[in-house]
Amino acid sequence: MDKYIGKRLDGRYEIHELIGQGGMAYVYRAYDRIENRWVAIKILREELSDNSDFLRRFRNESKAIAVLSHPNIVKVYDVSFGDRIQYIVMEYVDGITLKQYIEQQGEIKWREALYFTVQILQALQHAHERGIIHRDIKPQNIMLLEDGSIKVMDFGIARFTQAETQTMTDKAIGSVHYIAPEQARGGHINDKADIYSVGVMLYEMLSGQLPFVADNAVSVAIMQMQAEPTPPTRINPSIPKGLEEITMHAMEKNPAQRFPSAADMLEDIERFRRNPEMVFNYGDQVDHAYARGTSIYDTAGSRQQDYNDNYEYEEEYVRSRNGAKASMVGAGNVAAVD
């Protein structure tokens, strides 16, 4: 029997059930007797309590999320780094991972894929503006709630852009199918590495396939650095050309050729949403908005308002979910634990 189930941590958190586990931590559903709410508690494995690298990663997660406050990022409520037990108390998210949803659905309709992508990018924009790079964006780290809202989680290997030191373990870390080429080679990274990972997820949602697959992680990493992905329209011809361009632009090998920021990618998604027939021709379009140093919107605030006013993707999502809602009921999940 699990030694934590039935126990109360710090006289406050009643642990009810194990809902996830990985190489670094266990995640439990617990009830907060003070705030009268369900929470998720991530507890570091005892055998890792003396491992400085895992301790740093574990504590870094709470440190990173503590400076973030966004509806699309899992909240941290409390932390405890004692001698006997180390844990993080987080928002309890009852849903499934985006990876599970992709596996259930196969190819995802492009409007729905964009509905998810916009929320992910808004979360990353919030993090990047505060100097935090996630570095492990993948559908396993994205929670999907039944109403279609997205929660980005697992900032365990996030890095502050102003950090003075970066170990070799830091440089090469991430999930090989989604990491940027510069991550794969252990080079310097910035927020454009997260943009690349979003591009890979969008590719996977639209085509139902990962851009690079091989027998081992090293081979996939080499492909990330050297191979060109099959254009997603060759796999799914129903993908609009402009959306394919957005996807491939996010996945450029050279970080300097990607979207400069999450905000810029959001901007072009909005342009495409308003006119799904448009194409971007990123390779030779010299008057693109970010090349001019201007925006198609007067202010960032008005841009954000456009995203929030009447997002048509939500209607598409609700319609598509009507036939699949049962697959999410009872499939509660919370955070990836590594």
Predicted regions and their residues:
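Conserved short submotifs of the Hanks-type protein kinase catalytic core
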Residues: 83-97, 101, 105
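Protein kinase glycine-rich loop
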Residues: 16-22, 27
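Juxtacatalytic C-terminal regulatory tail of Ser/Thr protein kinases
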Residues: 260-335
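Activation-segment/catalytic-loop signature of the eukaryotic protein kinase fold
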Residues: 79
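C-terminal lobe helix-coil module of Hanks-type protein kinase domains
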Residues: 177-280
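AlphaC helix of the eukaryotic protein kinase fold
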Residues: 45-67
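Protein kinase catalytic-loop region centered on the HRD/HxD motif
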Residues: 120-132
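Activation segment signature within eukaryotic-like protein kinase domains
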Residues: 116-117
